[in-house]
Amino acid sequence: MAPQTCAICQKAKAMVKRPKTGEQICRECFFYVFETEVHNTITQANLFKPGDRVAIGASGGKDSTVLAYVMKMLNERYQYGLELFLLSIDEGITGYRDDSLETVKRNQQQYDMPLKILSYDELYGWTMDAIVSQVGRKNNCTFCGVFRRQALDRGAAMLNVDHIVTGHNADDIAETVLMNIMRGDIARLGRCTSICTQGEDTIRRSKPFKYAYEKEIVMYAYFKKLDYFSTECIYSPDAYRGHARVFLKDLEAARPSAIIDIIHSGEAFEVREEVKATQRVQQVCQRCGYMSSNALCKACTLLEGLERGMANSGITDRARKKLDAEGPAPDNLRTIPFFKPPSGGPLIAIESVS
């Protein structure tokens, strides 16, 4: 049987079957369509304006490594006029993050981008290893997710950037939609498919890989021979997200378009006005100045519980009431430095290409 030719150029031998479309295409055409789709995602959503300082959330994994490579290449190819930086968060996970940061440092040299590394220990006075020793593995992802999100904003503020881009892909977003449905989290369900988010006191954050399948990102990294770290977090097997991931993979096996279908369904969800009226208004944390829907932001609440020897007190409202019953926080309580976001300007669209 003769080898199949590329469905796009009709010349070269097909080497890739795209999970998203089922097309069999050659390697060079795969590079072109992958890069062009990311470019069109960026331009159609008006993510950047010329002169923006953009921090790429870099973990050393496949998604962030491919994102850094593609952002640099598209910035040069289409003259976005962006100033790019790598921003890494060191959670303090021995045998995982310390090794992946070595990959990030190599990426810094390979892509010629400035690198900023901010650690949990530096910011919060705790590493994830120390936190897990206190809370166990059941709720550790809650601490890490809250601390990491705020650390990214704080690291970006230190770099004085206008924008953070992360390597969240289509699989990640579809999983998040499923998780929010299973948890009945209306507030997050209403915004989890947004390609770009920004509060009054947070830095603009977006996902250029919103419509890129994880399998295609892996194939891109493989064919481009990119340098990335492939070990999973040692604490992630116990994460709630794992259940949504298994379910999504089963759906994808039966229907490859399930990932994009779920994202489009999530985009179509609208929170009713009467439900919006019951949601908490965003304000500023009284202790650290970060955005919060309560008097104290989640990071400060979790940190206070750790510092007072009641680590799980910040997980639920009931546990928080138990901590409050112990009395006010001591004056010498370790706190997070006050947050001062950089200022940004209005967006001017970068033109799309077909």
UniProtKB/Swiss-Prot annotation:
The keyword RNA-binding applies. GO terms for molecular function: nucleotidyltransferase activity; tRNA binding. InterPro entries: CTU1-like_ATP-bd, CTU1_C, Ncs6/Tuc1/Ctu1, Rossmann-like_a/b/a_fold, TilS/TtcA_N, tRNA_thiolation_TtcA_Ctu1. It is found in: Cytoplasm. GO terms for cellular component: cytosol; cytosolic tRNA wobble base thiouridylase complex; mitochondrion. Pathway: tRNA modification; 5-methoxycarbonylmethyl-2-thiouridine-tRNA biosynthesis. Its EC number is 2.7.7.-. Signal peptide: none annotated. GO terms for biological process: protein urmylation; tRNA thio-modification; tRNA wobble position uridine thiolation; tRNA wobble uridine modification. Keywords: Cytoplasm, RNA-binding, Transferase, tRNA processing, tRNA-binding. PANTHER family: ATPASES OF THE PP SUPERFAMILY-RELATED (PTHR11807), CYTOPLASMIC TRNA 2-THIOLATION PROTEIN 1 (PTHR11807:SF12). Belongs to the TtcA family. CTU1/NCS6/ATPBD3 subfamily. NCBIfam families: TIGR00269 family protein. Plays a central role in 2-thiolation of mcm(5)S(2)U at tRNA wobble positions of tRNA(Lys), tRNA(Glu) and tRNA(Gln). Directly binds tRNAs and probably acts by catalyzing adenylation of tRNAs, an intermediate required for 2-thiolation. It is unclear whether it acts as a sulfurtransferase that transfers sulfur from thiocarboxylated URM1 onto the uridine of tRNAs at wobble position. Prior mcm(5) tRNA modification by the elongator complex is required for 2-thiolation. May also be involved in protein urmylation. This is Cytoplasmic tRNA 2-thiolation protein 1. The lineage of its organism: Eukaryota, Fungi, Dikarya, Basidiomycota, Agaricomycotina. The gene is NCS6.
